[in-house]
Amino acid sequence: MTRIFFNQQYPTLVDISQRWQLEFDKEAEFELKFEQNQLSLHKRDEPKLDGIVVDFISGAVAHRRKFGGGRGQSIAKAVGLKQGVTPTVVDGTAGLGRDAFVLASLGCKVIMVERHPVVAALLEDGLRRAYDDAEIGAWMTERMSLFPGSSLEALAKITDAVDVVYLDPMYPHRDKSALVKKEMRVFQSLVGADLDADGLLTPAMTLATKRVVVKRPDYAEDLDGIKPSMVIATKKNRFDVYIKAAMK
């Protein structure tokens, strides 16, 4: 079980801890709080850091949904979004769900897979609020769902027809920007790097009927040492695309 600190007098937090099999530990490095109708994760020895929340309604993700370039974005091109083609996507390494949300906002049905129970709890809480939102709730309910568990398990268990598997394994970041530093510091100390990421490509290729997309920092080697069919480069990252069949 994952150890976490939380206020045991708060029924909502007790329910969440039981649901995700989180074990209370007064010495734990991380704390879960439930305030203003949202679940947040805090690093206890860095109280000045804001809590990490999954928020699909406001902030950076909402701004990107409204002004982020639509289907012209690199991620949209990578998964094969085009006129008349809106693929079903499994995001095998969901994290805070930002890339999954971008794809869902562009029309894709997205199944998010997340193996760390604390991160999955944050995702579930973000989905709960998004499903209830007047502006995005209807299409979020239709398009975005969560499959808790490891990618290796999920890729074997998911029975839906899946066009694309999207992978963004946690990789040691060099970026020194404040946001990346904050979130990656907290995240990497919580979940660690995805040391088994190389093992994801083969099951992903088995599940995807059309393609597998792997997001990598520009300095990272190819996943599992396998050269992609094509690469879409951005300023700091790249999307390695492994094509099985044409998008149609």
From Swiss-Prot:
Please name the GO terms that the record assigns under molecular function: rRNA (guanine-N2-)-methyltransferase activity
Q: What class of enzyme is it?
A: transferase
Positions of S-adenosyl-L-methionine binding: 98-99, 114-115, 150-151, 168
Primary location = cytoplasm
Keyword line: Cytoplasm, Methyltransferase, rRNA processing, S-adenosyl-L-methionine, Transferase
Q: Which domain of life is it from?
A: Bacteria
Q: Which Pfam families match?
A: SAM_MT
Q: What cellular-component terms does GO give this entry?
A: cytoplasm
Enzyme Commission (EC) number: 2.1.1.242
Protein purpose? Specifically methylates the guanosine in position 1516 of 16S rRNA.
Q: What is this protein called?
A: Ribosomal RNA small subunit methyltransferase J
